[in-house]
Amino acid sequence: MGKRLFGTDGLRGQVNIYPMTADVALRLGLAAGTHFRNGNRRHRVVIGKDTRLSGYVFESALTAGLCAAGMDVYLVGPLPTPAIAFLTRNMRADLGVVISASHNPFMDNGIKFFDKDGFKLPDEMENKITDMVLDPDWQWDYPAPERVGRAAKIEDSPGRYIVYLKNSFPAHLTLDGMRVVLDCANGANYKVAPLALEELGAEVIKIGTEPNGLNINHQCGSLYPGVAAGKVLETRADVGLALDGDADRLIVVDEKGTVLDGDQIMALCADDMLRRGALRNNTLVATVMSNMALEVYMKERGCKLLRTPVGDRYVVEAMRREGANLGGEQSGHLIFMDHGTTGDGLMAALQILRIMRERDRPLSELAGQLQLFPQELINVHVERKIPFEQCQPVLDGVAKVEAELGDRGRVLLRYSGTEAVCRVMVEGEDPEQVKRLASLLAETVQKHLR
């Protein structure tokens, strides 16, 4: 039909405004169930969510649609997105569903799917599901009454996920004596993350672990790393860890209160894996948003940085294609393919804590190897996402900025896959020049793409 429901990270929008409505979710459950039902055996679906109040609405609607399509539904409650990917594999399910809008505020929600192997669905599969949802005349292939699905709650899911996480941490190591500030954004990891770290021996100072359905990501979590940074300095902690609402991304704070983004974390992990001979094909996969300094850093070590479009699903696709086992995004999505299939904030945190413990050095020293180029990112609200090549003034503006930067900088324009926003990014060596050029280009975009 040509229309799309899904962005770079599933379906997302404001609750009770199309397409984030109960009736769309019901049809989405029917469509997904129809698509994944194969043969006469019982089919299984795992559904998890974050802590948003509206999660109950979409959990019920999806469950109704999936059961009507003949799928047995297992409800695991509030759990991180990567936990659903793991449980889908672990429980031999045919499909995993996450109800979350990630780092967005509580009034938004979203729906994304994982296949039986724990990977996000490719575009072509999402498009097939979309066609069924959007076609009002679609003839549903309902199963016989005795073949409709059942729904059941699974109570031990958090424990399964914790065991899985701890299995990625060396058995001979503990976190005894380590003080960790942990900000869970009042989101999906509010129970699991503190418990996992405490079981490994850490002293955990908690932030954002009291969700009420409305406070997810509210002035806490990975979008507000200053909160964790302040607590690190106040408590003299060894490290600060800030997760987002569905806990698939991580921002880290060192013992001096310095915030480290995904690029700096990837550099640290790549260096560690190189030292251990574990970086497969000497390749790190990142997106077009990653800092130029990361590319230089990898080249200096005889390694390759492979860039993809923005979205951890595209990073994962490239990792699978290239045989890489480390990838991520500047925003804090980090994928360790030896352990998981998608971005996992707590898994990434455990890898960093392991490096700190094994090297017995403060994080500021370990992560200080990567000196980032100045980078300015401006989000410009747009009403319509017109292809850039159809707007000559914007193309002229980009060319002008690129000419001034020369080969010591770069420009990137891209539309958000989840918001009505055009992201304007300028990078170079001179911070004042970078800031000035980004502002000029953002003004051009705002004027001609509104």
Swiss-Prot record:
Gene3D superfamilies: Alpha-D-Glucose-1,6-Bisphosphate, subunit A, domain 3, Alpha-D-phosphohexomutase, C-terminal domain
CDD domains for the chain: GlmM (cd05802)
GO-annotated biological processes: carbohydrate metabolic process; peptidoglycan biosynthetic process; UDP-N-acetylglucosamine biosynthetic process
Modified residues (Phosphoserine): S102
Active site as annotated: S102
Pfam family name, one: PGM_PMM_III
Segments crossing the lipid bilayer: none
Tagged with keyword Cytoplasm: no
GO cellular component, one term: cytosol
Post-translational modification: Activated by phosphorylation.
Enzyme class, spelled out: isomerase
PANTHER family linked: PHOSPHOGLUCOMUTASE (ALPHA-D-GLUCOSE-1,6-BISPHOSPHATE-DEPENDENT), PHOSPHOHEXOSE MUTASE
HAMAP family in the record: GlmM_B (MF_01554_B)
Family, as annotated: Belongs to the phosphohexose mutase family.
Protein name, per record: Phosphoglucosamine mutase
Organism placement in taxonomy: Bacteria, Pseudomonadati, Thermodesulfobacteriota, Desulfovibrionia, Desulfovibrionales
